[in-house]
């Protein structure tokens, strides 16, 4: 006789619904300024769990069967697919306040399309200068599609914070912006969004923003990307498969609502690319390290076989 299916406790932390006045204020500020700081989304316990899981990924470069960070530039260590790491990362993405504010700003067809973070290293270089985030095919766009990012600091950020020019959103198609173009903006329109660990904010990515300069101490932060998946993507992001379907951890997906499942893209293959392979070739060192690793495995196998042969010879005596 078959036993009843095992039931598991709910995993998704469902906070109380936010007061409507809070939602209204956040939506109004986001529409007016392009950016809004959200009231506390998570507990200190949740934050510690997220920090610990994130720090483990930052201990080493990703290699073979070792999980870790990716590094494609000098000043950042990238952690992809953070929804795999800890329950808190999922809870933040699906927080009732986040969902309500974004749905009123973007409409009801939005999804979470990307969830990653990085450790920014100290530098005085303005390596990630003023820009709006390019993501859609501007040749097909009749207007400026809206996209919102949720940012959360995992460390106290006293320098190198997100800088944002209030009211610069939905004015032009996103592009790199030169420093000389910024001088015409009043200083009180340029905000430096410093804050303690756990600070969360939403911003329209078409607005002009950058990572602040200088970065005096390491900064850990996560960034979630929400937009309508039906908007045609720019070719660069298709080639890189940037907006692939989310990678999720089944342990963190208990008690999801239908809306949560839609936001996480359950069953949506719009931007799925079968048998995707990146067109660029890996660097020379990639093949070199792979060859060295293969040689080490063969040497280990040889040592085991020699040891086994010696044991047999010893027993024979």
Question: What are the language-model segments listed below?
Answer:
Residues 115-117, 150-152, 222-226:
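A structural signal for short, well-ordered beta-strand segments
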Residues 2-32, 39-137:
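Non-heme Fe(II)-dependent double-stranded beta-helix
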Residues 126-192, 233-238:
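Catalytic core of non-heme Fe(II) oxygenases with the double-stranded beta-helix
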Residues 182-197, 250-252, 257:
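A conserved mid-domain beta-alpha-beta active-site/ligand-binding segment of alpha/beta enzyme cores
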Residues 2, 207-208, 212-317:
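Non-heme Fe(II)/2-oxoglutarate
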Residues 42-44, 117-120, 135, 157-159, ...:
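Short, solvent-exposed loop/turn segments at secondary-structure junctions
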Residues 194-209:
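Conserved metal-binding segment of the jelly-roll/cupin
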